[in-house]
Amino acid sequence: MARARRTKRASVTDIYKGCKASGTCPPDVINKVEQNTLADKILKYGSVGVFFGGLGISTGKGTGGPTGYIPLGQGPGVRVGATPTVVRPGVIPEIIGPTELIPVDSVTPIDPAAPSIVTLTDSSAGADLLPGEVETIAEVHPVPIDNVELDTPLVSGDRHAILEVTDANPPFRRTVTRTQYHNPAFEIISESTPLIGESTPSDHVFVFEGSGGVQVGDANESIELDTFPSRYSFDIEEPTPPRRVSTPIERISQEFRTLRRALYNRRLTEQVQVRDPLFIRSPSRLVRFQFDNPVFDEEVTQIFERDVAAVEEPPDRDFLDIERLGRPILTETAEGRVRVSRLGQRASLSTRSGARVGARVHFFTDISTINAEEPIELELLGEHSGDSSVVQEPFESTILDVNIDNIPESLDTNIAETSVDYDSADLLLDNGVEDFSRSQLVIGPSDRSLPSITVPQFESPRETIVYIQDIEGNTVVYPKYEERPTIILPTPSGPAIIQSPTHSSFDYYLHPSLRRKKRKRKYL
């Protein structure tokens, strides 16, 4: 039987809001919201006779209220854990603003009783343009300084009096201002030179030749200068040895130490060196048989889902039961080589809950060292002068230079004719020696293309016998007759009957192995 699900009851506040208007609220809800329970009544009636306010009871602060703990028979209490109040003298603030300008000559205001007609003066009179002193009268109105009376508050009570003393002459604050004017006639020119050196704001001294100077020391000495070779010269330069690091800064982080401890810990991680080149290019083909996917990236962590109960033989025995193979990690060995490492996880056992248990394996392979190539002297491509040989096949015959003037006018016609017997068998003989050391032996009909087999040349005094098998046609083999011994195969026979005569009679008994075996029957 299924157990009924317990529904959550609404809060007291929600019930009070819904039932107060209709007047159907339970008494406990009304007393709870309106604070009319038994505990509330005890607090109300008890607070009439006893007052504990301001003591901070049951607040958890431990400060004794706003007045602190007061020992018996002593003065005011001390607040626990609070810093003492520091009384500082008050400083009269000053108003920061523009300074007061003192007028040089103020304009006299117009008197209301003065006439409204202004008398004009004759401007045709000659103005005084001669230089002279201009008298300036400045009226300074002193600022009245009254004695400032400071009212000190009067504090009365049973406690000690605390006086707030204020300095009558506060310290005067000085203000320093700086004004900068822009001069349009002055122009600053900043320029930089491409020369290598250091320039300081000190004065530079320039020495010019021909201005007449005094020679100090011996006569001048001519020094032969050498020209520095540029990088565009055609000289062969020795290659610079490769640098191990570009910046001598060692940055060792906690992650690197943890990773190195996980890879090279022989107690927790199995070390396996892989020599197959597929480990760098496509390591998944070493774990299981599959097709190549050109879209998949082998540089990420690979997870192989398989059934532990199923027996699957991987292409490489070192990757047996591999469930997870991490991404490649490039490190440097002590010999200076680059090592490619991958951290794998085996799934050798499986529990009933589905958890798989296996050891961690560190697969690594070292990349071979790439030696620096030897420098090769290069030649310029272009026209150059030199001897060249041109061979033409039609003119490979021998050419004789014969002087025509030395030929006699009459030729001797009495030339003995060579008698040749064309019926002789010597003409059929071929004196040429054939060499079949680089020949090819073709077996089969010539109407179709067949693979060619090259017969190598052996430096041996013995006769060379080459056996060639033709798998496309019929092969007839005529073996030599040899006398072979006749092999008599044993015929199968039953068990031998063993007789053991005990008397002179012909009685016998069967061997225990020949007796019929009794079948065991199961009785219910």
Curated annotation (Swiss-Prot):
Belongs to the papillomaviridae L2 protein family. Interacts with major capsid protein L1. Interacts with E2; this interaction inhibits E2 transcriptional activity but not the DNA replication function E2. Interacts with host GADD45GIP1. Interacts with host HSPA8; this interaction is required for L2 nuclear translocation. Interacts with host importins KPNB2 and KPNB3. Forms a complex with importin alpha2-beta1 heterodimers via interaction with the importin alpha2 adapter. Interacts with host DYNLT1; this interaction is essential for virus intracellular transport during entry. The lineage of its organism: Viruses, Monodnaviria, Shotokuvirae, Cossaviricota, Papovaviricetes. Minor protein of the capsid that localizes along the inner surface of the virion, within the central cavities beneath the L1 pentamers. Plays a role in capsid stabilization through interaction with the major capsid protein L1. Once the virion enters the host cell, L2 escorts the genomic DNA into the nucleus by promoting escape from the endosomal compartments and traffic through the host Golgi network. This is Minor capsid protein L2. A motif (Nuclear localization signal) lies at residues 1-10, 516-523. Keywords: Capsid protein, Cytoplasmic inwards viral transport, Disulfide bond, DNA-binding, Host endosome, Host Golgi apparatus, Host nucleus, Host-virus interaction, Late protein, Microtubular inwards viral transport, Phosphoprotein, Viral penetration into host nucleus, Virion, Virus entry into host cell. GO terms for biological process: microtubule-dependent intracellular transport of viral material towards nucleus; symbiont entry into host cell; viral penetration into host nucleus. InterPro entries: Late_L2. GO terms for cellular component: host cell; host cell endosome; host cell Golgi apparatus; host cell nucleus; viral capsid. Disulfide bonds join 19-25. One of its GO terms (molecular function) is DNA binding. It comes from Human papillomavirus 22. Its main location: virion. It holds the Pfam family Late_protein_L2. It is found in: Virion; Host nucleus; Host early endosome; Host Golgi apparatus. Highly phosphorylated. It comes from the Viruses.
